[in-house]
Swiss-Prot record:
Interacts with the SSU processome. This is ATP-dependent rRNA helicase rrp3. It is an enzyme of class 3 (hydrolase). Belongs to the DEAD box helicase family. DDX47/RRP3 subfamily. It catalyses: ATP + H2O = ADP + phosphate + H(+). ATP binds at A104, E105, T106, G107, S108, G109, K110, T111. InterPro entries: DDX47/Rrp3_DEADc, DEAD/DEAH_box_helicase_dom, DEAD_box_RNA_helicase, Helicase_ATP-bd, Helicase_C-like, P-loop_NTPase, RNA-helicase_DEAD-box_CS, RNA_helicase_DEAD_Q_motif. One of its GO terms (molecular function) is ATP hydrolysis activity. Residues 286-434 form the Helicase C-terminal domain. A motif (Q motif) lies at residues 60-88. Residues 1-60, 447-486 are annotated as: Disordered. Keywords: ATP-binding, Helicase, Hydrolase, Nucleotide-binding, Nucleus, Ribosome biogenesis, RNA-binding, rRNA processing.
Length: 486
């Protein structure tokens, strides 16, 4: 399909008019209550660290931060030329033996910020079962493990990934080999702590809770409480999160000792300066046609399309493949091997478009993403931040476009209010967009038939795809898979 040249058009007056009518109401409803203040007690002191130092005074290398030569060489090998702000602020404090709360925007280098101090401590005093990292999703757990192994290759660090959806027997064998680092989702780790003979974390030295806000969003709180009770009190604990909430504050009070807070983002809902953010305001009936138009506008670039449901993820992937796009779906109803396969194909460039539910929105390191398309507007500002954080990473530029229909306006205005910034409408010409309509309608018919066959083939499994509640009546989360991590 040929690319369509873009022409500038005036902003859609109907959207601006609707926005102005709703501004008062939006301001009221978008107000988010602040977390409860943290008492400044001796056991629970939080010191704000901000990125206000002059650039000339900032450490220029990992060696300047106190990282040993062997780990600095690993950083060089991986292409880490200079520490990121979160690494500059947190690593020296971690090397001093302090507990940390790290708050930074997505794509800021948080993993290396906690991995390097742990590896340096392990190098100084080697022992098995040295560190534990808890992550909300399987993909993030595998990614963290890969980064630990890459950074720790010079000291031959051994990692074990313990996640739900996999056979427990090989995991028990891996734990029996006493790895240095365990990276786990909370539910499956608790299974092993309760059921795997001889497995204990009594000698653990370091605990990391990564993406802590999402761990709590997914109702892992009670499981975390049980895990914390069996860990030694004399340990170092790092809590990393893109956002702060009252739940996260409660978790840090329960798990950290005299922590320091490293906060890089000045805004609760901060996006990086290299990210271009736009929207298009369109009728719902033409949503697919405008999506194809946008993909042609960004032809040859890698893109993630975010949808709200598993059903839409499947349908759009079929629609795009019918039209000749290299698209692959990623959602919670896929098997673990299928999900990892989808990610690997996208990373390798054999598929240029990933169609995903919010399971892909947090923590996945896909450096080559050029464009994020919010086919469905996210339901809250935090989800928006984490979606668009898939592009414009590590100083690179990126583009995010939200498809806003007449039914999404109020939510979108709340997101704008939280960001503190009005977005600019992406210029489109309706006549040029409608050129795609006949082929899109044909592809839609094909996708409907494929989805019907898919539902029939899957039988009971199709109940989730059709949006029904799970049989056990469990509350549905942002993505069904995330609730099955244990």
């Amino acid at each position: 399909m040929s690319s369509v040249k873009r022409r500038k058009t005036d902003k859609n007056p109907s959207l601006e008019g609707l926005k102005s009518k709703k501004t008062k109401e939006s301001k009221k409803e978008s107000h988010t209550p602040s977390p409860e203040p943290i008492e400044d007690t001796e056991d629970n002191r939080v010191i704000e660290e901000t990125e206000e130092a002059e650039e000339d005074d900032a450490p220029k290398s990992f060696k300047d931060l106190g990282i040993v030569d062997s780990l600095c060489e690993a950083c060089d090998t991986l292409g880490y030329k200079a520490p990121t702000p979160i690494q500059r602020e947190s690593i020296p404090l971690a090397l001093q033996g302090r507990d940390l709360i790290g708050l930074a925007e997505t794509g800021s280098g948080k993993t290396a910020a906690f991995a390097l101090p742990i590896l340096q401590a392990l190098l100084d005093k080697p022992q098995p079962l040295f560190g534990l990292v808890l992550a909300p999703t399987r993909e993030l757990a595998y990614q963290i493990s890969q980064q630990f192994e890459a950074l720790g290759s010079v000291i031959r660090v051994k990692c074990a990934v313990i996640v739900g959806g996999m056979d427990m027997v090989p995991q028990s064998i891996a734990l029996g080999k006493k790895p240095h680092i365990i990276v786990a989702t909370p539910g499956r780790l608790l299974d092993h702590l309760e059921n795997t003979k001889g497995f204990s974390l009594r000698s653990l030295k370091y605990l990391v809770m990564d993406e802590a806000d999402r761990l709590l969003d997914l109702d892992f709180g009670p499981i975390l409480d049980k895990i914390l009770k069996v860990l030694p009190r004399e340990r170092r604990t790092y809590l990393f999160s893109a956002t702060i909430s009252s739940k996260v504050e409660s978790l840090q009070r329960a798990s950290l000792k005299d922590p320091l807070r490293v906060s890089i983002s000045s805004n609760k809902y901060q996006t990086v300066s290299t990210l271009i953010q736009n929207y298009i305001f369109i009728p719902l009936i033409h949503k697919d046609t405008y999506l194809i138009y946008l993909l042609n506008e960004f032809a040859g670039q890698s893109a993630i399309i975010f949808t709200r449901t598993v059903n839409e993820t499947q349908r759009i992937a079929i629609l795009l493949r019918t039209l000749g796009f290299g698209a692959i779906p990623l959602h919670g109803q896929l098997s673990q091997s299928s999900r990892l396969g989808a990610l690997n194909k996208f990373r390798a460039g054999s598929r240029e478009i990933l169609v995903a539910t919010d399971v892909a929105a947090r923590g996945l390191d896909i450096p080559s993403v050029d464009v994020v398309l919010n086919y469905d507007v996210p339901q809250d500002s935090k989800t928006y931040i984490h979606r668009v954080g898939r592009t414009a990473r590590a100083g690179k530029s990126g583009h995010a476009i939200s498809v806003v229909t007449q039914y999404d306006l109020e939510i979108f205005m709340r997101i704008e209010a939280a960001l503190g910034k009005k977005q600019v409408e992406y210029p489109t010409v309706k006549d040029e967009v409608m050129v795609f309509k006949p082929r899109v309608e044909e592809a839609q018919r094909h996708a409907r038939n494929e989805m019907k066959n898919l539902h029939e083939d899957r039988g009971k499994k199709g109940a989730v795809l059709k949006g029904r509640r799970p049989a056990n009546g469990a509350k549905r989360g942002r993505d069904e898979m995330d609730r099955e991590e244990g």
